[in-house]
Amino acid sequence: MNYNVKLIYSATSASLGNKGSDQSLSPYAFTKSKNLKLLIHLRKWFGFNYEAIYFYNVYGPRQIQAGNMATVIGIFEKQYLDKKALTVVNPGFQTRKFTHVKDIVNGCYRVWKKNLNRHYSIYENESYSILDIAKMFNSKIRFLNRRKGERYKSSTVKYVEDIKIWPLKCKYKIKDYIQNYINNN
């Protein structure tokens, strides 16, 4: 493989939890983890250059608000606009880390410029429970039954296999984003 090609792979934090056992929680986590394993092997076998960036609950303008790929923030925004109760999967204490889409774009650009063939993670330092996020919207809350495959804790790790994951700093905060959303809607 001598094509001077570089890939920036959008990895997922969904497959990192519970010492790797979360890789089988969903088809999404499963395929993302297998793709990453393939990239790791392509580097070992052929010297293939890539950067992997682990994204954490991306939010921002024009995010998906309905359907299987909807983001939790997108769902809450739609429910807020429709003046419906925000739906939270029981018990609501599931924690997540969040990343604004502008931090994703800036992070991808910085990684591309560095060209170091590393793994990176990008997320706001603070974790929030889904219930705490819902409360930030100052709306009624309705609890849904627990779901199979639900992760209960945000998973941040420092290594995948023997590869160090380098943290990238975020500029944007989910609290500020939600407050701004409420103020403008």
Predicted feature residues:
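Conserved Rossmann-fold NAD(P)-dependent oxidoreductase catalytic core, especially the SDR/UDP-sugar
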Residues: 1-27, 51
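Alpha-helical substrate-binding/gating segment
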Residues: 58, 74-87, 95-121
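Conserved beta-loop-beta element that borders a ligand/cofactor-binding pocket
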Residues: 11-12, 38-62, 87, 141
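Active-site helix of classical SDR
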Residues: 27-34
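Active-site beta-alpha turn of Rossmann-fold NAD(P)-dependent dehydrogenases/reductases
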Residues: 8-13, 54-56, 92, 123
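Mid/C-terminal beta-alpha module of Rossmann-like enzyme folds, strongest
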Residues: 82, 105-149
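Glycine-rich Rossmann NAD(P)(H)-binding loop
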Residues: 58-62, 88-98, 120-128, 135, ...
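Conserved C-terminal active-site "lid" loop/helix of NAD(P)H-dependent oxidoreductases
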Residues: 101, 129-132, 147-180
